[in-house]
Amino acid sequence: MEIFLTSISGILVILGMILVGFVMGEKGWFDDKSRGLIAKLVTQIALPCYMLYTITQRFTAADLLKMLPDLRFPALSMVILLGIATAVASIFAVKKERRGLFISMFFNSNTIFVGLPINQALFGDASIPYVLIYYMCNTTFFWTLGTYLIQRDGEGEAEFDLKTSLKKIFSPPLMGFMLGLVIVILHIKLPVFLASDLQYLGSLTTPLSMIFIGLSVSNAGVKQLILKKDQLLILLGRFVVAPLLMAAIVYWAPLPALMKQVFIIQSAMPVMTNAPVVAKLYGADSDYAAVMVTETTLATMVVIPILMVLMA
C-alpha cells in the first residue's frame, strides 16, 4: 500500500503541473508560437543545463563508465519492439499512410519530457543515470529508424539523411550529458558560480515540460481523444507489450534493482512529443500523432502506479 501511495503521490505532483498548463491553454494564454518557445526552452536550455549539472555534481567517473555497457538492454528491447510493431501493423491492417508513424510510436517512448520527471518523482535523483542510459538509446532509434519510417508515410520517397540524423541524435540534451561525462572523466571541477547557474536553469526542466504537455492536451481538444483500433493498439504496445518485454529482458540480468525499475518505467512512457513535429515536417498524419501523444500521456497517470505495485 505504501508503494502505491508513493507512486500516486509522484504522479499527482506531475499531474498538478500538467493541469496548470492545461488551464493556461484553455484560457488562451499561449498560441502555437509560444508553445514552441516553451519546448525550445526545455530542450535547448533547461535540459542541457540539468544534464550537465546533475552529471558533474552527483557522479564519479567510475560510476558512469560502469553503466555504459547497460545500453544493450534498452537497445535489445527496442529492436524486438520494432519487429512486434511491424507485425502488429500488418496483422491488424493499419492504414499504409500511417503505418510508419504507427510503428515509430509503438516502439519509441517519451524518455525525457515525461520519463525524467516521473522517475525523479518516484525514485529521486539516484534514478537519473539510468534514465539517461535509456534516453541515449531511445533518441538514437527515434532519429534514425523512427524518422525514416515516418518520412516513408509522407509525401515522396523516404531518404535517410546521415547528416540530419546525426544532428538530431546529438541534440542539446545529449550534448549536455556527453559534456558532463567528459568533465567528470577528466576530473574537472566547475566553478561554484557556473554550477549554480546550471542548477537554476536546470530546475526549469520539470515544470516547463509538464506545462508544455498540459498546453498540448488543451490544444488537441478533449473531444479528439477517442479510442479507435489504431489508438488502442498503440496504447497496448506502450503500456503492456513494452514493459512486459523489458521486464523479461532484465529479470535475470545482474543489474541493480533501481536500474531494472527505471528501465521498465521508461519503456512504459507515452509517445514521443517529437512525433507530431516530424510527421508534420514530412507530410504524414500529424493529427494522429498529436492525439496519441495526448492519450498516452494521460494514460501514463493510471499505468505508472499499477506498474509500481507490480514491481514491488
Segments and roles (model prediction):
Residues 1-312:
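Alpha-helical transmembrane segments of multi-pass small-molecule/ion transporters
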